[in-house]
Each structure stands twice: as structure tokens, then as C-alpha cells.
Amino acid sequence: MKVIILGGGVIGVTSAWYLVQQGHEVIVVDRQSSAAEETSAGNAGQISPGYATPWGAPGIPLKAVKWMFQKHAPLAIRPDGSLFQLRWMWQMLRNCDASHYAMNKSRMVRIAEYSRDCIRQLRQDTGIEYEGRQGGTLQLFRDQKQFDNAANDIAVLKQEGVAYELLTAEQLKSAEPALEHVSHKLTGGLRLPNDETGDCQIFTKKLAKMAEEAGVTFLFNKEIKHLLFDGDKVTGVQCHDGLLTADHYVVAMGSYSTEFLKNKITIPVYPLKGYSLTMPIIDASRAPTSTILDETYKIAVTRFDNRIRVGGMAEVVGFNLNILKSRCETLKMVVQDLYEGGGDISKATFWTGLRPMTPDGTPIVGPTAYRNLSLNTGHGTLGWTMACGSGQLLADLISGNKTAIAADDLSVFRYIDGFNTKLLRPGQKLDAVY
């Protein structure tokens, strides 16, 4: 089968890799000059299934109000003038109760855990290197309430069979020795020993090269205009320089997927702006050995080979890619507060990108009402964490293979009123109930 994938970030490239491994003829189309030049270029570097957590959570509405008046707030909301922004925020608020939070986190952890298994297998099969480390992740708490609230996440981790360690402030140095200097500022942490780290851009570019060697065609510097339809079927994709046709089409365009599919498929994917800082290490003893997540500021600090990557925060501001000085100051403040002297802050470089976020935090992976059109988007801040699993899952769905994990509630159909996988008859296709 000939498959065209629209989007050359980590989601599009992993989709291409797994599809070509199953014998398909694959073409990847992207407007950039090479793979992973947008959202996949500068993320925080964490592969953290256990921290796969919806932004829509109990208490978030009240916290959002408080954050409006804080200098280093993890979330900022500024009107972009669109009705879609208001609708998306309302949908997220509707997911901020305990029952929705538990359901959404369970879905996210499922695909994230599977994805980590997939990247481990990929690493074993190919030997791909991307400055990766398998040292676990550590969520840091700065007050007792955060420490106590970890019980809610631990309940889901137990349910999903995810290994964890709840550490006191004094025990943090066993996982991250450099934190010994700042243990008095912390109340403890939640460590997930099976999580990983790595440079997403390096990984994506190397996998793209491997995919090309395996037969995938990459068409870069190509502006994608729109899809052509005939009834319930896609007949082609119009680009700036001509028409491309295939048997099946995959939209993996991140935050731009929503507008691209407008008037054909409604998906609630909104651009959540994030920031990162990268600096060279000057004292390894004061740098992280793996990665931490500061729960107060929602900022991750990750160790690459000779660099420290600091990333996080969220701005609901539309497609705005301006780098704000205040956000850069927050990144600098957090890394200097926890790992002072570990990196050369004077040589820090800054980046911003748009994470494709759904209101329930769960990605959209799978079929649509159009029989030869699939989606792989909406991974939010966890695109790197979920990429390989999403790519493998999508390839299996397109190939008609039995999937390794439940997939129905990861598709766009979950947004249909009254959606319930239990109502589906055995063998019934989801597009029949659209």
C-alpha cells in the first residue's frame, strides 16, 4: 500500500518507520528543509510515561487564576481572538474533575508505556543513538501539599503497573546527587526508575535517515495546501507544486492539523506554546544525571551528553512564536535554583515551539470517517514520550494487524457524544458509528 504522511516531525517520522517496516511504500511531506525542525527540535528531552498527566486536572481552574498574578507561572492564557480558543479552554475545564482526570491519565499512560517499550525495541534492533539515558525521571515537590497529592498519581501508576519510588527530601540525592545542595528547599519527590531521556531532534533526524535507507521517500520544502475528497475517500493532497496521490493518507501536522482538516473533520487540537533553554555543562557534579520535573513551575531539567536542556511552561496564545524574555528568565531561575554552577548560563540558547494539545490530554491516533485517512496528532507536551508507540499503533491499524494495546478510545471518535467502546459490536468499525 502507498501511504503519504503529512508532517516530518517525530510523529510523522516514527509513523513512516513503522509503516515501511510492514512493507508499505511511504512518502513523507513537510514544509521544512529537513526532519524535526519545528516542535520536535527543542523539547525537554524526557521520555516519561509515568508523568503522562493531563493538564485538565482537579484544582487547575483555581490554580490558573492564581498563576495569573505570579511572575514565574507555569501557565499563561492570552486571548488570540478566536472562538476556537474559547471552545478549547471550555472543553479542557470540563475535564478537570476527578473522574475525567483518572480516565484521561489512564489512556495517556497506556500509550506512553507502550511507546517506551517500542523505543527500547527500536534501540535494540537498530542501535540508534540520540544522547539517550535510561536513568529514570524524578518529580520534585517544593511543599507538603504537592508531596501528599502524589498519592493520586500513585494510584493510577499502581493500576497501570508502573514502577515508582516516593522519596523524602533526604533521599533525593540517591537519584540525583547534585540535589544534595538544595534538599532543604524540597519536601520530596516521585521517582519513576524506568523512564528515559534523549534528544528528540537527534533521534528524529537519525531515524529519518534510517527510514530513507529502508525505502521511505522524503519530500521537504513542500508546502501542503489541502486534501482532495470524493465521498468518504481522500483522492490526493494538493501541494504548492503539484498533486500527490496514494492509497492511504496520514495527517501528522501537530498544531496545524486542526486548520488543515477544517470543514472535513473537527479535532480539538490547540497550539500550547512551550519554551526551552540549552546550555553546555561546566561542572558535571552539579548537573543532573538524568532528568527532573519541578512540579511547582512545571519545568524539566534534563542531562544530555555535554548539555543541559531546561524546558516547560505553557502559553495558550495561539500561533505566536515570539520568545518572551520573562519566560527565559523563569527557565534560568529554575535551573540555577536547583543546579547552580552545573551549566554555563551565559552561553544558553533559547527556543520556543507549539505543542499540539487536546483538551483531555490524550493524543488522537487512528482512523477517521474517511476510509483511507488516519490521524496521528494531539500529543501535547508528550510527543517525544508517545512517538514510537503512536507510530507502531498507527502502522498496525493501517495494516489491519491486531494492536498491542486498546486503541478505540485513542481515536477522534471518542469526542462523539455518547461514545462508548462497550457499545461496539465485535468487528464493528468505528467509522460506522460516526
Curated annotation (Swiss-Prot):
Reactions catalysed according to its record: a D-alpha-amino acid + A + H2O = a 2-oxocarboxylate + AH2 + NH4(+)
Keyword field: FAD, Flavoprotein, Oxidoreductase
Cofactor(s) this protein cannot do without: FAD
Pathway the protein contributes to: Amino-acid degradation; D-alanine degradation; NH(3) and pyruvate from D-alanine: step 1/1
Domain of life assignment: Bacteria
Residues noted as binding FAD in the record, renumbered to the chain: 3-17
GO biological process entries: D-alanine catabolic process
Function: Oxidative deamination of D-amino acids.
Protein name according to UniProt: D-amino acid dehydrogenase
Record lineage: Bacteria, Pseudomonadati, Pseudomonadota, Gammaproteobacteria, Enterobacterales
Gene designation per UniProt: dadA
